[in-house]
Amino acid sequence: MTTKNLETKVTVTSSPIRGAGDGMETEEPPKSVEVTSGVQSRKHHSLQSPWKKAVPSESPGVLQLGKMLTEKAMEVKAVRILVPKAAITHDIPNKNTKVKSLGHHKGEFLGQSEGVIEPNKELSEVKNVLEKLKNSERRLLQDKEGLSNQLRVQTEVNRELKKLLVASVGDDLQYHFERLAREKNQLILENEALGRNTAQLSEQLERMSIQCDVWRSKFLASRVMADELTNSRAALQRQNRDAHGAIQDLLSEREQFRQEMIATQKLLEELLVSLQWGREQTYSPSVQPHSTAELALTNHKLAKAVNSHLLGNVGINNQKKIPSTVEFCSTPAEKMAETVLRILDPVTCKESSPDNPFFESSPTTLLATKKNIGRFHPYTRYENITFNCCNHCRGELIAL
């Protein structure tokens, strides 16, 4: 920074001059002093200081600024400006140039002599003053920016407070109406959404009611079927117990008959052996039979041998005919077996011959008495719908 084209203007306003005679005379203050400093040649101008102190008035420490109004007066505080040394730069002019003060004071300065300040010192002072002014300006700009931000924030706060105040008082009808309109639109949207949800829930409720009816009918049909199956199971269990008892009785009687037939076989063998004493042995004891049929066949052979030994070979025509009117009575076990067969299958039991009293019925005849109640239609909307039909229904199911 150089001092080229540096111009400083100092203007001192004139103050009223008091006349003589009252003891408070004042001299005419110095007029406006225009000081222009620049780097010029020492050959043409003499070097004068632009920073010389003005000649004070007779009352030192009082600056006459003219007539001041009390209500417009302002207190001015002095602010000390500290400039760091690093911010100060020195610009040394050339030897052929010098700083010369171009301004001069008009008037007479009392008690002061005009002196010459060296160019380097004057230049450093000017630089310091300019740096202070720039720092002051920068700080003032920062303060201005901060104050403007505070003003903007305060304006926004005041606006919001005004809105709140107006809304609380109730004078701002437009704001109130806008709020009511927004709330109304929001309520309309919520009402539409609730209406759609209600419609969906009603549809779901209707579908669930249909499903409930279907499952109720299924439950009733299954309960009827369960009752029928329970009754059928009880009847089958009772028949099973009766058949088991009859079979046990038949086996017991058969075992008794087997023991008696074995004893009869032994007696017949002893009789036949004793009859052949002293004669040619035509019969010798064979292997013991392993079943009741073999035992009966063996006894029949022994009886024929004894008969031929005692009676000889007698013709068949000479044998006495056994009356055909003789009827055999059934044993208790046989009667029980016949009763069970008659209960299980009456028709087959009547048609069976007397030679085969222990006719075995097929498994399908055991469930012949079960009612036909489980009928289904293949083209229904819901699968496995059971129609409760009686056992007389034989027609075709038609879905309407």
Curated annotation (Swiss-Prot):
Positions where Phosphothreonine occurs in the chain: T348
Subcellular location(s) per record: Golgi apparatus membrane
Distribution of this protein across tissues and organs: Detected in adrenal gland.
Post-translational modification, as annotated: ADP-ribosylated by tankyrase TNKS and TNKS2. Poly-ADP-ribosylated protein is recognized by RNF146, followed by ubiquitination.
Modification Phosphoserine occurs at: S15, S49, S353
Its biological purpose: Required for normal Golgi structure and for protein transport from the endoplasmic reticulum (ER) through the Golgi apparatus to the cell surface.
Protein name per Swiss-Prot or TrEMBL: Golgin-45
